[in-house]
Amino acid sequence: MVSRFLLTEYRNLTENPSEHFKVSVNENNLTEWDVILKGPSDTFYEGGLFKAKITFPPNYPYEPPKLTFTSEMWHPNIYPDGRLCISILHTDNVEERGMTWSPAQKIETVLLSVISLFNEPNTDSPANVDAAKSYRKLMHKEDLESYPMEVKKTVKKSLDECSAEDIEYFKNAVFNVPAIPSDAYEDEHEDEEMEDGTYILTYDDEDEEEEDDEMDDE
């Protein structure tokens, strides 16, 4: 049963790729996925491509998967060994703030929640105490440099560890992004929204092709 659930979710994610993450599966073990999470814009993590592994239990989706970062991370809710502490991956038997796991959850929801956590950490029960202390000092304007500096180190290291293929994936691919507000691209990408709801993230060759298509239509 677990294979059927995972195959369906994996197919949905690959047929409708996200600009925020990339997933791939271990061909020899469907219960192990590799994922790359893109650091969200306008945060200290912007520009980073952070690698992680998702491990699914035998009774998934009734038990949550586990997500462990393989990239070096500096975040209050990520243990130094890469294990992630987030409410959505806990059952209701664990006292955690926020939404907990249910069999109705989708991996896409989990990954978007992780990305959201980058900029909204929970410092009440931190997994990385030093990162939490540094973040609190940042929030209280006691130290505006230490936390951003440590995060930027991980951003650079994540890119050094990424393949050129993965970097190009996030740079050049076409994605369906229905959840993004229509005005999210109004400055830099105002003219790049397509009729089917996709966005092209680089425009050199594509713009020329669109112009040629318009001329052909005329």
From Swiss-Prot:
- Cofactor stoichiometry and binding remark: Binds Mn2+ ion which is required for highest activity. Can also utilize Mg2+ ions.
State whether keyword Transmembrane applies. no
Q: Which Pfam families match?
A: UQ_con
Which GO biological-process labels does this protein carry? Answer: protein ubiquitination
> What is annotated as the active site?
85
What keywords is this UniProt entry annotated with?
A: ATP-binding, Early protein, Host cytoplasm, Host nucleus, Late protein, Nucleotide-binding, Transferase, Ubl conjugation pathway
Name the domain of life.
Viruses
**A GO-annotated cellular component:** host cell cytoplasm
Which InterPro entries does the entry link to?
Ub_conjugating_enzyme (IPR050113), UBQ-conjugat_E2_core (IPR000608), UBQ-conjugating_AS (IPR023313), UBQ-conjugating_enzyme/RWD (IPR016135)
Inducing stimuli: Expressed in the early phase of the viral replicative cycle.
Q: In which pathway does it act?
A: Protein modification; protein ubiquitination
Annotated localization: Host cytoplasm; Host nucleus
Cofactor (UniProt): Mg(2+)
Q: In the UniProt record, does the keyword ATP-binding occur? A: yes
Please list the residue ranges annotated as the UBC core domain.
1-160
GO terms of molecular function: ATP binding; ubiquitin conjugating enzyme activity
Which top EC class is given?
transferase
Its EC number(s): 2.3.2.23
The reaction(s) annotated as catalysed by this protein in its Swiss-Prot or TrEMBL entry are:
S-ubiquitinyl-[E1 ubiquitin-activating enzyme]-L-cysteine + [E2 ubiquitin-conjugating enzyme]-L-cysteine = [E1 ubiquitin-activating enzyme]-L-cysteine + S-ubiquitinyl-[E2 ubiquitin-conjugating enzyme]-L-cysteine
Q: How does it assemble?
A: Interacts with host 40S ribosomal protein RPS23. Interacts with host translation initiation factor EIF4E. Interacts with host E3 ubiquitin ligase CUL4B. Interacts with host RNF138.
Family, similarity comment: Belongs to the ubiquitin-conjugating enzyme family.
Role, per record: Accepts ubiquitin from the E1 complex and catalyzes its covalent attachment to other proteins. Performs the second step in the ubiquitination reaction that targets specifically a protein for degradation via the proteasome. By controlling the ubiquitination status of specific host proteins, the virus may target them to degradation and thereby optimize the viral replication. May be implicated in the shutoff of protein synthesis through its interactions with components of the host translation machinery.
Q: What is this protein called?
A: Ubiquitin-conjugating enzyme E2
Species assigned in the record? African swine fever virus (isolate Pig/Kenya/KEN-50/1950) (ASFV)
The gene name on file is UBC
